[in-house]
């Protein structure tokens, strides 16, 4: 816990200093705020260091064992008989082992550099309060999950970095990236649907529909939970079957309430945010 608190406070104050010493710049004709790159880079380095050199957090041991089994050459990866799913992820691991290092700890470090780096760069480019973005990233549990779900968060970080493409409607670039990310983790395929949904007006019919479906699934979880578990049982995620059935009503209620706070605040400030934040619709619907 000591490392955790040091990470939280050091990154918060480094990002606070970065914002306080930042300034407005013109990027492609648009006036945008940029925090001080030196302090922001130091905060990013702290997050990467803690993640990349972690020991015993979540599935870290499992991933390190897995990295050891992946061939240390790209040719060996192509001919490996047991790699059938999430092949893009294992291809990246094989590339790292061949070109950088075969040490599993260094593979973890490379994954942290890419995942945390992409997330942090996206925060840096799209928020005026980077210290709050990083604070919420850590305290909401997202930072911890990057260490537990390495495949999921690697794919998520790439798609998060590319989300401005949704706003610009650059589907010719975005959709192929989604398909590539699905080779890292198949859950990325949901973004094929989300591309056509999340740029709808906030608090319109789309928002109401998503909230209705979410509440419906929560209320009917005793019925829908086992159905979902049965569907997952025939896939690579079948190991989550028992968790879905035995976990009561799914996610921890405290986490649900915490994650609902930004939604409530965005509703209360919807009239102000609509005209000021260009990514308001996308961020709200993705969060919901």
Predicted regions and their residues:
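Short hydrophobic/aromatic helix or loop-helix immediately within or flanking a transmembrane segment
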Residues: 61-72, 78-101
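Short acidic/glycine- and proline-prone juxtamembrane loop motifs at membrane-interface regions
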Residues: 147-153
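Transmembrane-helix signature of polytopic, membrane-embedded enzymes
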Residues: 120-140
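Start-transfer (signal-anchor) and selected internal transmembrane alpha helices
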Residues: 1-47
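Membrane-interface transmembrane helices that cradle and orient dolichyl/undecaprenyl
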Residues: 159-172
């Amino acid at each position: 816990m000591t490392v955790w608190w040091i990470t939280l406070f050091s990154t918060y104050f480094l990002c606070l200093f970065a914002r306080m010493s930042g300034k407005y710049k013109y990027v492609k004709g648009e006036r945008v705020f940029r925090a001080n790159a030196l302090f922001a880079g130091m905060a990013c380095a702290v997050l990467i260091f803690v993640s990349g050199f972690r020991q015993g957090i979540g599935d870290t041991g499992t991933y390190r064992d897995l990295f050891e089994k992946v061939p240390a050459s790209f040719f060996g990866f192509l001919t490996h008989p047991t790699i059938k799913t999430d092949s893009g992820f294992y291809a990246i691991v094989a590339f790292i082992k061949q070109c950088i290092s075969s040490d599993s700890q260094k593979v973890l470090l490379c994954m942290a550099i890419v995942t945390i780096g992409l997330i942090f760069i996206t925060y840096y480019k799209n928020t005026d309060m980077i210290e709050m973005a990083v604070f919420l990233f850590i305290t909401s549990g997202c930072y911890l999950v990057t260490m537990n779900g390495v495949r999921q968060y690697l794919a998520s970080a790439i798609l998060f970095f590319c989300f401005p493409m949704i706003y610009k409607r650059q589907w010719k670039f975005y959709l192929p990236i989604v398909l590539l990310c699905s080779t890292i983790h198949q859950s990325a395929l949901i973004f094929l649907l989300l591309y056509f949904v999340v740029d709808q007006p906030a608090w319109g019919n789309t928002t109401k529909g998503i909230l209705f479906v979410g509440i419906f699934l929560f209320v009917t979880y005793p019925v829908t939970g086992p159905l979902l578990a049965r569907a997952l049982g025939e896939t690579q995620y079948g190991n989550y079957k028992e968790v879905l059935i035995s976990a009561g009503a799914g996610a921890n209620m405290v986490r649900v309430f915490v994650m609902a706070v930004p939604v409530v605040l965005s509703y209360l400030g919807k009239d102000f945010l609509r005209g000021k934040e260009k990514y308001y619709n996308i961020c709200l619907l993705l969060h919901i």
